[in-house]
Amino acid sequence: MFLLPCIVISWYVTKTPIPWYYATEIKNYLFARAHPEDGGWGLHIEGESSVFGTSLNYTVLRLVGVDADHPKMVKARATLHKLGGATHAPHWSKWWLAVMGVAHWDIVNPVPPELWLLPDWVPFAPWRWWIHIRQVYLPMSYLWSKRWQAEETDTIRSLRKELFVEDWDKIDWAAHRNTIHPRDNYHPKTWLLNMLNWILANVWTPVLRVKPLVKKAEDWAMKLIEMENENTDHLDLATVSGPMNLVALYARDGPDSYAVRRHKERSDEFLWVKDEGLLANGTNGVQCWDTAFAIQAVMDAGLTEDPRWRPMLLKALEFLDDQQIRENVKDQDKCYRQQRKGGWAFSNKDQGYAVSDCVSEALKSVIILQKTPGFPTLIDDRRIFDAIDTLLTYQNPNGSCSSYEPPRAGSWMEMLNAAEVFGRIMVEYEYPECTTAVVTALSLFHKHWPSYRSAEVERFVERAVAWIKTNQRPHGGWYGSWGICFTYATMFALESLASTGETYANSSHAKRGCDFLISKQREDGGWSEHYKVSPTPPPFYNLQPPNFQTRLTNLTPLHRPAKQANTSSTPPVLR
């Protein structure tokens, strides 16, 4: 629920017209997703109302023309005030409100672009952060340094009265830098970060921050933004950093520059309409990811040679052929990017960020089809090898795989996590889902090309599977981060073991994983898992429809009891 505000606020402050039909569907969606009891909004659609979600989505509704006296707005505003008002918002919300001029910049904890000037050997230099955080920090730091604010409007003046409990002119903005409602304080700032913020706000900024250094830092931050635009054709990594970059470029160049116009054109790719209205994706789609799994689903059903499925499968193969990333980014080392040649992105090659599991699933699908009689070889061996070369760069020292790149620093970096509403975001982490995807892709590749980098592939798989085993929880499951949650990761981990010949009959790890899933089967025969499994146990709750989790469980190597209907009470058979 925090993605749509990024786009809409960026439109408003850059004076981008919002078509009436966009405005209508945005109203429909946010009204449909308001909390049924208190009228507010949370971090996501299942979450309880928070200052973060309510302050930003209330603002969006005002920007698309909803009157402050509308009954739903009155109800939402009452909830926001009950939570303390926008002074109790987390860092990202305060930053957006400061960009609008609804809040004063003094309420925002320091975001100095000077960090980008640190030598690469510094343990906490920004290039070591997780890719999403460093891409968000770029425009955040640039605009904080400029203290840029949108042109004042009647709506902005009105929001100053609506979002805060105190009179706007009497608020001690600096005193509220660290004010946050407990509901938003998922990851409280550490003593170290609080100390650094105090030094930056009270010593560095007013006393030591000289103009030549500031200009150098701002220029380098903007150069990195420009490289991001060039490498993604102005899509940028995701729906948070992209709108922020639009505002930063608008602040520097005005409305008529190519970069600003292109950003506005491409922002539509993050939006989609469903029955409830218009909302935003976390990326510009899931095209490569979904295409790869659609191919594998047909394969698992034994239909790849069925002529009825051939037209769809051929188009899917042609799509993956077209969307393979054929080169590394320009100035790869200079802009701190991971090797990507031969890979696939989550969405498309324009966005251009290869991800370990996206590369793996697409590669498996290509191999499956191109090794099926009657399908053309659109992607030749050299391009297949390019994908393998990139996959082999993803392994971490402990054998696991992360998402976009291997970790560049340790988890201690979370001591500098300023977001407050998110944990485990400062660096890359290892994931059983990503590790499994790479293991299964390399295993399939090795069967067909046993001589290409053979020793490296075998060693990679051996170390990765060993890590999968050490990552198993005492109850037998695995914890996932890219899906909910134990069901999701256990499905992948068991697939890893199965791809190397470990089954229920011959592997204690596979047996424990299968037994774990069976122990969580519902009386109706299905499985369900609540999102609040993350981060605290117990891991399973019977609080949501079982269809999705049941499908995940049926995809695990239980000798595939997939014919069992969701309504069946017959347990799957383990052989």
Locate each region found by the language model.
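Preference for long, amphipathic alpha-helical scaffolds in soluble/luminal domains
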Residues: 1-575
